[in-house]
Amino acid sequence: GTLTFERADTERFPCLRLAYEAAERGGNLPAIMNAANEVAVQAFLEEKIRFTQIADIIEKAMSSFCFVQNAGLEDYFDTDRQVREELQKQL
């Protein structure tokens, strides 16, 4: 069997586009994305949101929470806590 690879369809898979953005920008953005994703997926599993809302919630979190370019360990912990607390209130 031969493996073939094609360019990822980021329109069809918007969370992949967000992951690329988080990886490219760095800082605490991957932590924002991860926390938002985990909260959104849990809300979906609890039938509080639709599956198609997950990417929207992540994207909104990535654009609204404080971005720290040179994040230290405490910044990551604080970011994770803040994102989870705020999104859990909203959802």
Question: Across the structure, where does each feature detected by a protein language model lie?
Answer:
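Catalytic, metal-anchored helix/loop core of enzyme active sites in primary metabolism
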Residues: 1-91
